[in-house]
Amino acid sequence: MYYIGHPSYYRKHIEHVCFQHSGILKKRNYQKNQKKYIMKLNESAMKNAEKKSNSYLAIRMTRSGYNYFKGICVCTFLLSTILYLGIAVIMSHLCVFDDTAMLYLRQNRSRLAESNIFRTLFISWIRWDAIYFVDMAVNGSLFEQEWAFSSLWPKIISFLAFRSKDVVLLGIVSCFASIFFHAIACYALYLLTKSIFSNQKMTAYTVIFYCFSPSGIYMSVGYTESLFAAFSFLGLLLFIKKQQYPAAFLWSLATLIRSNGIFWCIFFGMPAIGTLKISLERLQLTFMQVSQLVGYGTKCLIILVPFFYNQYLGFKLFCPGVAWCNKSLPLIYPAVQEKYWNVGFLRYWTLNNIPNFLFALLSIIPILFALFYSISGSTLHSFRSIKSHLVLSALYLYIGCFHMHTQVLNRMSSALPLLYWSMAHATLYAKSRNLKAFGHCILFVWIVYTVIQAGLYGSFLPPA
């Protein structure tokens, strides 16, 4: 122990004070570091919370955007359908060129015809080919020319009408069935476009172009176009999901509805040609290639069998009593088309049909545009099965221009998705302003035409 004044006492005292002071400093540094750590934790927590809120907002915005574009598609479908059918009803009262629907109604008794509403709907919506389908639903295919129409569609109408023979009921049921299948076709095209392009805006514009396509009112009355489009788009949706046999089955049903359904074989024929090309280049045919070719051939047969079976039934019923039975390929469908509608190569190229060619330009020009736009450097060029779509569209264009009543191309092209994709893509994403303007112009012209077309249909005026 040291007394006060001893040098060692002061040294110990100084050490003690320094020790206490260093402890205070350490404590203060610890508190500062702790505060900094807490601040860092708070900052990271805030950042994480902000990220979560941003992701939540992004999800909400994505969902709201999805619902927005989906709502546009639904509204477009409802608006176009109601508009066309309403105009047809109005025009059927203002100006009627032909009384065939009324005469047919007088020849066939109907309880529903006693109601003014049902009678008005029948004489407004049942025109042209729709009368054939109603009559076939009542009596079956009695006449040779009726074999140019689908035998499945009248059976569907009859089934939905509970096998009734009431022509008014059958006619109205056929229209509402068409509207239903038109809705399915719209939704299938929506899902198909969304699956391929993953772009909601592109999907919505595709559906808008489809709803206002030149097929117009024929998608909502007792015609086969809407059912054919539904089977076609559903088949394509399964095809891109690599469910090829179900796709082939749906396309075979499309062939039962319209004979041009056989062209869906292109989607199996093109890969088969590619496989053969590879085998020829390598001068060998492997087991896997053989199995692929057999698979493609089987799928093509699934699509073709309904068409040729229907031709066989016609041959069995009418032959050997008619001239076409003696042909090398005795098919009833092309025979009655030639006999009753003068269908054949360049037979429609007459001066009096120039107006019908002008009507057909509504489809011819956009299809030509779709072909060139898809081949060019657009995004569509990289689409996997673009070659099959190009061949299908080119084939439709060739047959429509040179082998049939050209204005029918406006209806037949309703099941060409490439047409709507190219128009929608050009309208939204084309680099050239002229191409964007062209897309908007086509949409405007289609809307104007379909409104006029609905009025002409209600008045029983061409084009049909």
Swiss-Prot record:
This is GPI mannosyltransferase 2. It is a multi-pass membrane protein. It holds the Pfam family Mannosyl_trans2. Mannosyltransferase involved in glycosylphosphatidylinositol-anchor biosynthesis. Responsible for the transfer of the second mannose to the glycosylphosphatidylinositol during GPI precursor assembly. Signal peptide: none annotated. GO terms for cellular component: endoplasmic reticulum; endoplasmic reticulum membrane; glycosylphosphatidylinositol-mannosyltransferase II complex; mannosyltransferase complex. Pathway: Glycolipid biosynthesis; glycosylphosphatidylinositol-anchor biosynthesis. The gene is gpi18. Its EC number is 2.4.1.-. It is an enzyme of class 2 (transferase).
